[in-house]
Design a protein with these regions (language model features):
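Short beta-strand
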Residues: 35-37
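Conserved, mostly hydrophobic/aromatic
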Residues: 40
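Sequence termini and other peripheral, non-core segments
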Residues: 1-16, 22-25, 29-33, 47-88, ...
Length: 182
């Protein structure tokens, strides 16, 4: 299971689709609708959020925005904040649209989860995930590797490369991350 901290526009097709499926699974786990994956380390940051289901819904919403921009068909009806989907989607000064800066990314859409509090992600985690993504893309989609470089250049600093739900903070790789050498 990989729920990327990186902005969805940086993910190649396989990573975007897999992330969508795995985050839908995360939503099921948090709702108590499945017995599997309940202790998966990728769930830690969502469980720590004051509104975990709303955070997952905000995350999924941005994945769906990127899918729409690419002409993919992700079923938004599968996104739900919980038993009362019509309820509040969070509060606070932070917004799940904070990192909306790149013309190559699907950031401009209205987000119904914009008031969900951001999740901190250490810069070291982003660096690791970007290196991991580059490694994966180099082996499976060299054409995307070129697009990835262009999109990274357009975003500028690495802190602008986070998924809009995440706020980049100083720090190393998350303790829950199972790192690989590549």
């Amino acid at each position: 299971m990989r729920i990327w901290s990186l902005h969805p526009c940086l993910l190649d097709r396989r990573a975007l689709v897999a992330c969508w499926r795995e985050t839908l699974l995360t939503q099921k786990v948090l709702r108590g609708l499945t017995r599997g994956y309940t202790n998966h380390p990728q769930l830690i940051r969502f469980r720590a959020h004051p509104q975990p289901l709303e955070a997952v819904a905000a995350y999924l919403s941005r994945l769906a925005d990127e899918a729409d921009a690419r002409g993919y068909s992700f079923n938004r009806a599968l996104i739900g904040a919980g038993e009362d989907d019509a309820g509040e989607h969070g509060a606070g000064e932070n917004s799940a649209g904070k990192n909306d800066t790149d013309k190559n990314c699907a950031d401009k859409a209205e987000n119904p989860y914009a008031s969900v509090a951001l999740i901190p992600v250490p810069l070291g985690q982003l660096e690791y995930e970007l290196a991991f993504l580059r490694h994966k893309v180099a082996g499976r989609d060299p054409e995307w590797e070129h697009q990835l470089s262009e999109r990274l250049a357009a975003r500028g600093e690495l802190a602008a490369c986070a998924h809009p739900l995440f706020e980049v903070v100083p720090g190393a790789i998350e303790p829950w991350e199972k790192t690989k050498d590549f």
